[in-house]
Amino acid sequence: MGVPGVFNVYNALAAISAVSFFDIPDQAIIDGLRVAHVKGRVEPVKVPGNYSLLIDYAHNALSMENVLTTLRRYRPHRLITLFGAGGNRPKVRRYEMGETSGKLSDLSVITEDNSRFEDVMDIIEDIKTGLHKTDGKYVVVPNRKEAIRYCMLNAEDGDIIVLAGKGHEDYQEIKGVKYHMDERELIADIIKEEHLAD
C-alpha cells in the first residue's frame, strides 16, 4: 500500500472484503492498493527542502494519535503538528487534542480551524490547557496560512510536518460563512511568496 498506518491496513482489508463479492481479479486488487490514496489522509505535498509536509484530516484526539504514532515510526528529526479545533464543539475535544499533540509531537503549532461562532483565541486557550498537561513545546500562530508559513520557514532537514484537521476540506468556517481555503493552495502561495522554489 502507498499509505502508512495500521488504520489504513484496516481500511484496505475492509475494501478487499467488499470487492471480493464482485469477481475482481486478485492482481487488480493488488494494483489498486499500490496506487490508492485518499485526499486529505496522510497526503504528501511536494515542497522544496529536505522535509516532508503532510495534510491529514485528523480532527480529534484519536485520529491525531493514530497519525502521529504512525509517523513517529519513521523516526523524523522532528515531528511538527499544526492544528486547531472546531468551534461550537465540545471543549473536551480541544483539551484532548492539545494533550495528544503535546505528548507525541516535538512541536505543536496551534492555529485556527473552523472557529464557527467562537473566538479563535478562546479555542486556542482550551487547546493550551491540554498541552500544559505535557512537557510539549508549542507556538501559537492564529492565522492558518501564517502558521503554515511558520512551519515551512522553520523546517529542518528530516522533519515531518503534519497539517492536521482540514484534510479534504477546502474552506474555513468563520461566523457562519464558509470562506474558500485549500491548504494545498496556501502552500503553493507560500512557496511563491517566499521564493522557496528558487
Question: Which residues are covered by each model-predicted region?
Answer:
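A short glycine-threonine-serine/GTX helix/turn-capping micro-motif
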Residues: M1-V6
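ATP-dependent carboxylate-amine ligase
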Residues: A14-G40, P44-D198
